[in-house]
Structure formats: C-alpha cells, structure tokens
Amino acid sequence: MHKRPLSILLRPLGLLYGLIAEIRNTLFETALLTPWRPPCPVVSIGNITAGGTGKTPMVDWTTKYFLSLGCRVAIISRGYGRLTKGVQMVSDGRHLLLSAREAGDETAMLAANNPEAIVVAAEKRKEGARFIQKTFENFPPDVIILDDAFQHRQMARDLDIVIVSASEPFFKARMLPEGRLREPLRNLARADIILLGKITDPDEADAIEHALTATGRPVLRTRVHTLGLEPVTDCSEESANTGVQLQALAFAGIAAPEEFLASLRRTGTDVRAHRFFRDHQPYTTETVRSLIREAKEKGLSLVTTEKDWFRLLGDPQLKELMEHAGCSYLKIETRLPEGEEKLRMALRDLVGR
C-alpha cells in the first residue's frame, strides 16, 4: 500500500536520471566526448543495475586467468565504503599496503587474493589508470581490469563485460531511484559479452537469455561455486571442519544476503539464525559484541562472507574479537559451466597470448 505512492513520487526522478544517462552516452557515441585510452589493453567488468550481481568474483576470476598467462595485471576499483578519497595504492603487486577500511572491503579482498596484481582504488578510473602509468612507467602492466565500470565511459576499454542477474526481474525494472537500473536496458548492446549469473530457475534463465540475445552479443552463463568454510584462525578449524553439521548464526552486510544463506546451506550448514546489515556497512564494537553474545547464548557458530571478514580485518579490535569467537567465512568462486573457453579466448586475444 505504501510502496505505490512512493514509486509514483520517485518516477519523475527516474525519468530525469535516465535522460541524463542517455545524453551522456550520446556525447560519447557522437565523439563530442572522447574516452582516454591507456597504452595497454583494458577489460571492464560491470553491470546495468545497482546492487550485487557477482562483479567482484568475476574480477577475481579474470585476474587469476590473466596471471596464469604470465601477464602483469592491474585492477582499478572504486573502493566502496573506504574511509579514504582519491587515488590510493592498495597493492603494488608485492605488498598489501592498505586495509579494508582504507581501500574498501571488495578492493582489499581482490588485492589479498591476487598478491601479484597491482590494485588501485579510485573513484575516477581514468585517474587511477594515469597513476598506474606514471608509477609503473618502467614496468607497466600488460592489462588493466576495471571493476564496476560499465557506466565509466571516460576511459576506453577493449572488452566490455556486463553481468546480469537472473534472480531479479530486471526487464521490468525502472531507473534509479525508483528502481535499480543505472541506464536504459537497450544500452546492454554496448557490451561485448553478457554474463548471466545467479540462476535459480532454469526456465526463467532461458527466457532471460533469449531476450538478451536480441542485443546481438554472446550470452554466457555463470554460477557461484562454494569452496567451503574457512576458519579465521587455526584454533577455529576444528569447529569448521569436523564433519559434524555446523549450527550457525550467519551474518552479512552485502547486497544479496539471501544468496549467501542459500550457499551456506549447500555446504550442509544448519543456519539457525541470521543478521543482515547494509552493503559495505562498517561494523562497530557494539555490533560485533552483540553477535558474539547472541551466538554464545544460542550455542551457535558465527559464519560470515569473505567480504565481511575483510571488513572486520580492517579493525584490529574487531579482528581479535572474531578470532576469539571462532568465526568462519564462506569461500566462493565464479565458474562458467558453458562458454568458458569462449571467454578465455577473448581474453587471450586481448593480450596476444
């Protein structure tokens, strides 16, 4: 009853948002605005909606593949939720230089999981790329990966990958702020490859894939593969890997927490209680103590996402509290059940490997 009047109020803002997006895109398409091109190939991984579609795991997959080819890789991410501003070096490809508080949880996680990659946080991806070009002038990267950059057209890219979630009816979605669309759906035709992820209903996924083929772009399906629970300390390993069904209090501050719970249950974890927070929301000592107290009272083990664990790692006190509590986090990765070789070939062609 309350949602419809609010939707009506927000609709004019959505129309204005869409108009501004279209004007901006037209300026680039008519060459009135020219994107800056760095000296190395660029891959952009983004989406057309606000919220989680699985961009970060896909950036991780792409980075690992380029590294396996022997490439020197640089990642540029906005660094959502960080306390710093401007261009920040998160990793120089040898050392992790910033915590999640300074770099953003996703950016810090990408850097820690890919220690050989250069990782930079920058709201303006072009400024981040110029910083990399200047800093690593004598040993430049072979390829730059832009995280969440489909709408960041100031920087040219050689391969535009867009991820679409099959778990939300985005074809019926409206523009921000009424809905979750960042720009009109017809702009998916600007992508080079469309990845369809978060598939729960195969029939619905077939219908979405059929609709996406109208863009004339290849559509490949992805899935989240659950690797299992990782204890945050060696002393919590026994509780996480005894083979006995884990009874858990799950907590997360991500865009799609229900999918986290579903992935947890696929590991055999018995989720008895859960607590959700806003995406990228900083944890406080009070919140963490409350979670630990509730888990202890109910006789449950604390389980969270890897992204949330990196956010907690950024604060030494919160890290210590969770280590003593025997917390574990869920480790996941992106896989492409079909079409993986097609994507690999596109990436290899880009770097001439």
Curated annotation (Swiss-Prot):
The keyword Lipid metabolism applies. Its EC number is 2.7.1.130. GO terms for biological process: lipid A biosynthetic process; lipopolysaccharide core region biosynthetic process. Pathway: Glycolipid biosynthesis; lipid IV(A) biosynthesis; lipid IV(A) from (3R)-3-hydroxytetradecanoyl-[acyl-carrier-protein] and UDP-N-acetyl-alpha-D-glucosamine: step 6/6. Pfam families: LpxK (PF02606). Keywords: ATP-binding, Kinase, Lipid A biosynthesis, Lipid biosynthesis, Lipid metabolism, Nucleotide-binding, Transferase. ATP binds at residues 49-56. InterPro entries: LpxK (IPR003758), P-loop_NTPase (IPR027417). GO terms for molecular function: ATP binding; tetraacyldisaccharide 4'-kinase activity. GO terms for cellular component: plasma membrane. It comes from the Bacteria. Disulfide bonds: none annotated. It catalyses: a lipid A disaccharide + ATP = a lipid IVA + ADP + H(+). It is an enzyme of class 2 (transferase). Belongs to the LpxK family. Transfers the gamma-phosphate of ATP to the 4'-position of a tetraacyldisaccharide 1-phosphate intermediate (termed DS-1-P) to form tetraacyldisaccharide 1,4'-bis-phosphate (lipid IVA). This is Tetraacyldisaccharide 4'-kinase. It comes from Chlorobium phaeovibrioides (strain DSM 265 / 1930).
